[in-house]
Curated annotation (Swiss-Prot):
Main EC class the enzyme belongs to: hydrolase
Organism: Verticillium dahliae (Verticillium wilt)
pH-dependence annotation: Optimum pH is 6.0.
Protein name (database record): Endo-1,4-beta-xylanase G
Listed pathway(s): Glycan degradation; xylan degradation
Thermal dependence of activity, per record: Optimum temperature is 45 degrees Celsius.
Superkingdom, taxonomy of origin: Eukaryota
An annotated GO cellular component: extracellular region
Family in the record: Belongs to the glycosyl hydrolase 11 (cellulase G) family.
Domain GH11: 43-231
Length: 250
């Protein structure tokens, strides 16, 4: 499940261990108020995927360092980490689609880390990323540059890389990784996934049947905090001041 996997091999000798079996967790819906901040915490060793407050979530860590994944109200999640190995997690949907994702929050890595829309497909088996922000390492730099796509107020460089006999959602397999990496970093805005899918197809980068699609925080040998929420159409209500993101489940 990890993006640093192939591309960080160009920068280090680290080999990530990904795609291990998950235990399921169906978290109860929690009514959150400003005065009653109830959180469900997942510790560094608790690799899992499931649903929480109407959203799909996935969390994986190799167990290194100190890292805590916290699922909050509605679509919100947060991660705090210090001197970690490798981890990736977030909230979103299952299956993935060409939806327009609105997200926001804060993301402040010290070292290698990034914030991305992250997902998988099967037939073909593809791991994909739309990277919105990153720390000290550009995760696309170890791949083959295919071109660019301009969408959602920015330009993204498109890369492809290959993982050979590496762990995946279907065990040890050989598969490709698709990347769109935003040239001007940001934390917050709209990501029109269909525009990336269309651009990838033009470069011969075809997807299969979608598995999950999350807005993920990932880190590798780094530290930092991340506090993110994800939404789709309901974001417009927040923009008009009718509700806040804490009140909305989309």
């Amino acid at each position: 499940m990890v993006s640093f996997k192939s591309l960080l091999l160009a920068a280090s000798a680290f080999t990530a261990v990904l795609g291990r079996p998950f235990d399921s967790f169906d978290g109860p819906d929690v009514n959150i108020t400003d005065a009653d901040e109830l959180l469900v915490r997942r510790q560094v060793t608790a690799n899992s995927e499931g649903t929480h407050n109407g959203y799909f979530y996935s969390w994986w860590s190799d167990g290194g360092g100190q890292v805590t994944y916290t699922m909050g109200a509605g679509s919100r999640y947060s991660v705090t980490w210090k001197d970690t190995g490798n981890f990736v997690g977030g909230k979103g949907w299952n299956p993935g689609t060409g939806r327009t994702i609105n997200y926001g929050g804060s993301f402040s890595p010290q070292g290698n880390g990034y914030l991305a829309v992250y997902g998988w497909t099967r037939n073909p088996l593809i791991e994909y990323y739309v990277v919105e922000s990153y720390g000290t390492y550009n995760p696309g730099s170890g791949g083959q540059l295919k071109g660019t796509v301009t969408t959602d107020g920015g330009t993204y460089n498109v890369y492809v890389s290959t993982r050979t006999n590496q762990p995946s959602i279907d065990g040890t397999r050989t598969f490709q990784q698709y990347w769109s990496v935003r040239t001007s970093k940001r934390v917050g805005g709209a990501v029109t996934m269909q525009n990336h899918f269309n651009a990838w197809a033009q470069f011969g980068m075809n997807l299969g049947a979608h598995y999950y699609q999350i807005v993920a925080t990932e880190g590798y040998q780094s530290s930092g905090p991340s506090d993110i929420y994800v939404q789709t159409q309901c974001k417009s209500l927040c923009d008009r001041g009718r509700v806040t993101w804490r009140d909305v489940v989309c």
